[in-house]
């Protein structure tokens, strides 16, 4: 199928490499990379300033971890809640913010409550206002996506928030390619 097309768009360099390995001509493959509304986000990034959004909500100055995206099983967000418990057991505390909603929302809320993490976890909910998303991401210390990162990486990186996700790239979404290990995040 690919060999009959005059050209094919793919989301990333890995997909392009895999198709070349399958014998598809490099000249017919174009990596276009995924993104969000870059012009709007660039304007917001240039005008945004630090705020006390997390200090005001949590009533503390702890570092804040954010996840922005759909709260679904493939994101493995239960692992993020488990990590908070491990950190708490080592006397290291962090705030955690979930921006989004999805099929795992109620399960995550129940787990957080059962583990006594209510004061450290904020289920912000779905937010389609890009100015608010910019403030939430910009003021977070780190974005973590234990499962597939997807557009979460693009959203976080555009506002200067480093991203951590898994390093099993054959199971990852193409947006992981935007993360530069040790520079803009890690795997």
Question: For each predicted feature, which ranges?
Answer:
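Donor nucleotide-sugar binding/catalytic pocket of nucleotide-sugar-dependent glycosyltransferases
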Residues: 2-55, 60
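Short hydrophobic "strand-cap" motifs at the C-terminus of beta-strands
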Residues: 11, 32, 67-69, 74, ...
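Nucleotide-activated donor-binding/catalytic signature segment of Leloir-type glycosyltransferases, i.e.
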Residues: 99, 106-127, 139
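Short alpha-helical segment that forms part of, or immediately flanks, the ligand-binding pocket
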Residues: 134, 152-159, 176-177
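Acidic donor-binding loop of glycosyltransferase active sites
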Residues: 135-148, 160-162, 168-169
């Amino acid at each position: 199928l690919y060999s009959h097309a005059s050209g094919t768009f793919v989301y990333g360099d890995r997909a392009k490499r895999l198709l070349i390995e399958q014998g598809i001509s490099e000249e017919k493959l174009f990596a276009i990379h995924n993104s969000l509304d870059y012009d709007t986000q660039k304007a917001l990034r240039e005008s945004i300033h630090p705020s006390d959004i997390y200090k005001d909500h949590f009533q503390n100055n702890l570092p804040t971890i954010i996840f922005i995206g759909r709260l679904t099983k493939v994101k493995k967000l239960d692992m993020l809640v488990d990590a908070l418990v491990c950190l708490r057991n080592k006397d290291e505390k962090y705030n955690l913010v979930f921006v989004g909603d999805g099929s795992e929302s109620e399960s995550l809320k129940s787990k957080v409550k059962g583990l006594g993490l209510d004061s450290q976890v904020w289920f912000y909910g779905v937010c389609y206002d890009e100015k608010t998303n910019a403030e939430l991401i910009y003021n977070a210390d780190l974005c973590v996506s234990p499962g597939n990162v997807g557009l979460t990486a693009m959203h976080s990186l555009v506002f200067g928030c480093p991203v951590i996700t898994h390093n099993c790239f054959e199971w990852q979404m193409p947006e992981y390619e935007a993360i530069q290990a040790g520079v803009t995040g890690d795997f």
